[in-house]
Amino acid sequence: RWASGAVLYQVFPDRFARSQEADNRKLPEWAIAKSWDAEVIGKGPGTAEQFFGGDLKGIEEHLDHLKKIGATILYLTPFFPGGSNHRYDASSFNEVDPLLGGNAALKSLVERAHAKGLRVMGDLTANHSGDKHEWFLAAYKNPKAPESDFYYFQDGNKKYDSWWGVPSLPKFNWNSQELRKRFILGKSSVVAKWLKSPYGLDGWRIDVANMTGWIREDNFNREIGQVIRGTMDDVAPDSFLIGEFTSDAANHVEGDSYQSTMTYSNFTRPVWRWLWNPKEKREEGQVGVGRKGIAASELMQLHKQFAGIFP
């Protein structure tokens, strides 16, 4: 498969490169306009609202750079419209954010990347949408809406469950067969749309895959990965599916679901222990991996043990 041994380069569109076309786009009210070389707000208020204006055309203009440094896969963080610079709070899954150049810009980027021998992957939040999403707005405070069972609403659809309690990220309820139909199941779904012509993405990375479909007594976690994979195999048999997991994901890569994972802990936890200095109050020591420093040889041993869990 083309993904074996590939070098994946992740791009956060707002930060990577800005084309001249971006100068003519009107910013939404939530955006804090920043000049390209301005200092970045590292944390706190304004972090998700600072807007530098990178776009898909800007990425297209720098594909030769990706080739030069050895990348073979371009992975785009979400390109759907949202209420933040990261766009993990999608307001629609049916269009590319006009601030990035719209649908035509994605089509052009993928075509140009393919011509240069690069694959292109997108990023989907199957765990949640944004609170400005068309489905959520249709159902909020409206229990009779067809989209009402797309989310975990309570109290006349005035309250709802969200990702880590963040109100702007309402959590999907995968009990809903209509949600499955619109989003992940079949050739008319969101998953399928962007893999097919005229866009031709080569695969998806599923955000917080470890939490998707899982809340209280509901656990559709493994099933949702299988449904997404089935749709992808149906519409684009050569496509590739990656899931984001913060813990052990070995049972999700057994052939019927994710083909690869972002399992940060396999790398970060041994590294944190290697870097740990008991004389300093470092954040790395607060994550439950122990505060005993280890040698480089032990780092490699731990990493191999984690990696060996996967088939």
Where do the language-model regions lie?
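Substrate-binding/active-site clefts of carbohydrate-active enzymes
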Residues: A6-L8, F12-T72, F79-P198, I228-D234, ...
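Conserved beta-strand positions in the central sheet of alpha/beta enzyme cores
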Residues: Y75, M121, R205-D207, I242
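Catalytic metal-binding/acid-base residues of hydrolase active sites
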Residues: T125-A126, A209-T212, T246
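Conserved alpha/beta catalytic core and glycan-binding cleft of carbohydrate-active enzymes
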Residues: K132, F136-L137, R229-D234, D238-P311
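Active-site clefts of carbohydrate-active enzymes
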Residues: D207-W214, A307-P311
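Short, flexible/disordered intra-domain loops and linkers
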Residues: G213-N221
